[in-house]
């Protein structure tokens, strides 16, 4: 869940987001070490009078500053590629949900059910109940079972949109005429909020996404009541 003046990432609630958080920390540590080394060298150059104007060739130094950056890039690339492959894997999803972006709302269709589909609009500020979040609540939440692989098929009816839920590590473009897919799985129940992350017009800021992750038994009861 996000909170005001937050500087870090949202709490991870999916295996993919946990991997992304670890990769972020891993890369940030490398960047911090490189920045510290560069600042240290710059400070030495500014505070010492020693110079090497007569040095014309230094094979050892050139070898080091060629091999070292290559090794650093490999340390960053390997875990990044691993996560990319993990994000593309979809292993026997138990449920498929088709998501369509519109100006300016989302529509959802549970393709495994005969007639389970609805539109999801933002609740206006004047209609919010105590404790609800401004610009993030919707009239119809996307109810999904937790701890199970779910496939999202994402597209758009009009312009470019982007279906994003930060705490699940999801951000997939909704492109007219093209069907993108993403897989999600939540480790625990709860409400997870997102928003359209592609500028799509005057009401771009009013396209929230709310996922309600529940145990499988509650999801089955909900789906039965909706059909």
Swiss-Prot record:
GO terms for molecular function: copper ion binding; cytochrome-c oxidase activity. Its main location: mitochondrion. It is found in: Mitochondrion inner membrane. Residues 46-59 are mitochondrial matrix. GO terms for cellular component: mitochondrial inner membrane; respiratory chain complex IV. Cu cation A1 binds at residues 161, 196, 200, 207. It catalyses: 4 Fe(II)-[cytochrome c] + O2 + 8 H(+)(in) = 4 Fe(III)-[cytochrome c] + 2 H2O + 4 H(+)(out). This is Cytochrome c oxidase subunit 2.
């Amino acid at each position: 869940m996000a909170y005001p003046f937050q500087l870090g990432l949202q709490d991870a609630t999916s295996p993919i987001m946990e991997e992304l958080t670890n990769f972020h920390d891993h890369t940030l540590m490398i960047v911090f070490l490189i920045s510290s080394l560069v600042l240290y060298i710059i400070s030495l150059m500014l505070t010492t009078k020693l110079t090497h104007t007569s040095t014309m060739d230094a094979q050892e130094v050139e070898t080091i500053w060629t091999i070292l950056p290559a090794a650093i890039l490999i340390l960053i690339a390997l875990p990044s590629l691993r996560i990319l492959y993990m994000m593309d894997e979809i292993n026997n999803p138990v449920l498929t949900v088709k998501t369509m972006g519109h100006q300016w709302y989302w529509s959802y269709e549970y393709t495994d059910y005969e007639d389970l589909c609805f539109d999801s609009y933002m609740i206006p500020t004047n209609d919010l109940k105590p404790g609800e979040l401004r610009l993030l609540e919707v009239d119809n939440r996307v109810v999904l079972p937790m701890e199970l692989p779910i496939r999202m098929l994402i597209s758009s009816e009009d312009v470019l949109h982007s279906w994003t839920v930060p705490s699940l590590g999801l951000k997939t473009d909704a492109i007219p005429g093209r069907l993108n897919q993403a897989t999600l799985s939540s480790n625990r129940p709860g409400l997870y909020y997102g928003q359209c992350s592609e500028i799509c017009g005057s009401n771009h800021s009013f396209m929230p996404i709310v996922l309600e992750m529940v145990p499988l038994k509650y999801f089955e009861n909900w789906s039965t009541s909706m059909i």
